[in-house]
Swiss-Prot record:
Homology family: Belongs to the glutamyl-tRNA reductase family.
Function comment: Catalyzes the NADPH-dependent reduction of glutamyl-tRNA(Glu) to glutamate 1-semialdehyde (GSA).
UniProt remark on domains: Possesses an unusual extended V-shaped dimeric structure with each monomer consisting of three distinct domains arranged along a curved 'spinal' alpha-helix. The N-terminal catalytic domain specifically recognizes the glutamate moiety of the substrate. The second domain is the NADPH-binding domain, and the third C-terminal domain is responsible for dimerization.
UniProt: NADP(+) binding residues: G189, A190, G191, S192, M193, G194
Gene name per UniProt: hemA
InterPro entries: 4pyrrol_synth_GluRdtase, 4pyrrol_synth_GluRdtase_dimer, 4pyrrol_synth_GluRdtase_N, GluRdtase_CS, GluRdtase_dimer_dom_sf, GluRdtase_N_sf, NAD(P)-bd_dom_sf, Shikm_DH/Glu-tRNA_Rdtase
Organism: Mycolicibacterium gilvum (strain PYR-GCK) (Mycobacterium gilvum (strain PYR-GCK))
Protein name, as recorded: Glutamyl-tRNA reductase
NCBIfam families noted in UniProt: hemA, PRK00045.1-3
Pathway(s) the chain acts in: Porphyrin-containing compound metabolism; protoporphyrin-IX biosynthesis; 5-aminolevulinate from L-glutamyl-tRNA(Glu): step 1/2
Note: During catalysis, the active site Cys acts as a nucleophile attacking the alpha-carbonyl group of tRNA-bound glutamate with the formation of a thioester intermediate between enzyme and glutamate, and the concomitant release of tRNA(Glu). The thioester intermediate is finally reduced by direct hydride transfer from NADPH, to form the product GSA.
Length: 455
């Protein structure tokens, strides 16, 4: 078994396609449940953000697992399998590990170096764990990816240039209406993105923030946090949105809803009471879109959506920081894979030692039968001597096979041990199933590919 990644992101598809593939927690649970119905898939989790949808799965066979995942995503999105594969990328085994480490480090983000994706990876894993859809392989992979992401951000300067999507949107807004200091804002959505938007607005010197959220208590908690920055803030339910737009200079919407929450009628009603003509900037960070597409056609309204953000020149990361981050990822990938290969040979080594112990015990029993009058102290000395001899004979080859197994292709040494000592594969598998350190994963050198589900 090995890890298979099937994904679509801002690098491979336009926003319209990402919208079709966008998922909420309920969708993700259904997708994973459908994927796991196949005997070819044993573990799975979904990483879904505003600019990517990726399924990580442990599969019994590459092509079979790929077909299962592709068909499930095709059914979910309403896209034909043929159309979906035009925008999909596939990574397998080592390439899948490298990709997740790069994603967690912010190297694959729309804005390189942003830290928000690290939290998104953490939530994807936590959700899968709570639904019991990850086992040992994805557990260890996810935990290592999170550790790698933290290391990259702590040891390099990549996050200094890695502004969030919110920061890029606000930069575009300032180009349109000038500095945000002293202005009034509306934040639609009080989740993690809404909180990030409020923080960025506070840093920009905004004077007042109105929070609009379906759950008023959650909106009030965010408003209270905003007031901690010394900024006036109140929370409102959704039906208060139109009048709040009347005095607003900028709106940031990021609810994660499956359909638009800011309608053309809402904006019409809000602007109808504006005393003096002014520009209203609406940053639509939802995926799918939070704002009705028709709103962009209103005079004086400037909509910044994900399409626009992804076309913007992103914050430039210093070459040295990016190179340092990639170097860390490469080192961590190599260490992780070496550890997995050693973990795979460990059950064979354990089975060999158990086989040797069984032989020793059988011979001691034979000794007891042949020399029933043997003094117990002499018998113990013989037993200890035999065990020491066996341990010394096995020490060098078992240590060496673990060292050799850490290199690519090292599984051949475990196979040689099994062959030379006639170790039953069922016995090895039984040991593997009982050891917490064992990992399922046949790290085959399969290529990273960017489509082909149709062969």
């Amino acid at each position: 078994m090995s890890v298979l990644l099937f994904g679509v992101s801002h690098r491979s598809a336009p926003v319209s396609v990402l919208e079709q593939l966008s998922t909420d927690e309920s969708d993700q649970a259904k997708i994973i449940a459908e994927v796991l119905r196949s005997s070819l898939v044993t573990e799975a989790m979904v990483l879904s953000t505003c600019n990517r949808v990726e399924i990580y799965a442990v599969v019994e066979a590459f092509h079979g697992g790929l077909s299962v995942i592709g068909q499930v995503l095709s059914d979910h999105s309403g896209m034909s399998l043929q159309d979906l594969t035009k925008y999909a990328y596939v990574r397998y085994a080592e390439a899948a590990v490298e990709h997740l480490f790069a994603v967690a480090s912010g190297l694959d983000s729309a804005v390189v170096g942003e830290q928000q994706v690290l939290g998104q990876v953490r939530r994807a894993y936590a959700s899968a764990e709570s639904n019991h859809t990850v086992g040992r392989t994805l557990h260890e992979l996810s935990q290592r990816a999170l550790a790698v992401g933290k290391r990259v951000h702590s040891e390099t300067g990549i996050d200094r240039a890695g502004a969030s999507v919110v920061s890029v949107a606000l930069d575009v807004a300032e180009k349109k209406v000038g500095p945000l200091a002293g202005r009034s804002a509306v934040v639609v959505g009080a989740g993690s993105m809404g909180a990030l938007a409020a923080t960025q607005l506070a840093r920009a010197g905004i004077e007042r923030i109105h929070v609009v959220n379906r759950s008023l208590p959650r909106g009030k908690r965010l408003a209270e946090n905003i007031r901690g920055y010394g900024i006036a803030a109140e929370a409102y339910p959704f039906d208060h949105l139109p009048p709040l737009l009347t005095d607003a200079d900028i709106v940031v919407s990021c609810t994660g809803a499956v359909r638009p929450v800011v309608s053309l009628a809402d904006v019409h009603r809000g602007l109808a009471h504006v005393r003096e003509p002014k520009d209203l900037v609406i940053c639509d960070l939802g995926m799918p879109r939070d704002v009705d597409a028709a709103v962009a056609g209103l005079p004086g309204v400037f909509v910044i959506d994900m399409d626009r953000i992804l076309r913007e020149p992103t914050a430039k990361t210093a070459t040295s920081d990016a190179d340092a981050a990639r170097s860390i990822v490469a080192t961590e990938v190599a260490n992780y894979l070496a550890g997995q290969r050693v973990a795979e040979v460990t059950p064979t080594v354990t089975a060999l030692r158990q086989r040797a112990a069984d032989v020793v015990e059988a011979e001691l029993l034979r000794l007891d039968n042949r020399l029933p009058g043997l003094d117990s102290s002499h018998r113990d000395e013989v037993a200890n001597t035999v065990r020491r001899v066996v341990d010394k004979l096995l020490h060098a080859p078992t240590v060496r096979v673990k060292q050799l197994a850490s290199a690519p292709g090292g599984d051949s040494y475990a196979e040689a041990l099994r062959e030379l000592f006639e170790l039953d594969q069922h016995a090895v598998d039984a040991v593997a199933g009982s050891e917490l350190g064992a990992v399922s994963g046949d790290e085959l050198a399969a290529p990273a590919i960017d489509l082909d589900l149709t062969e």
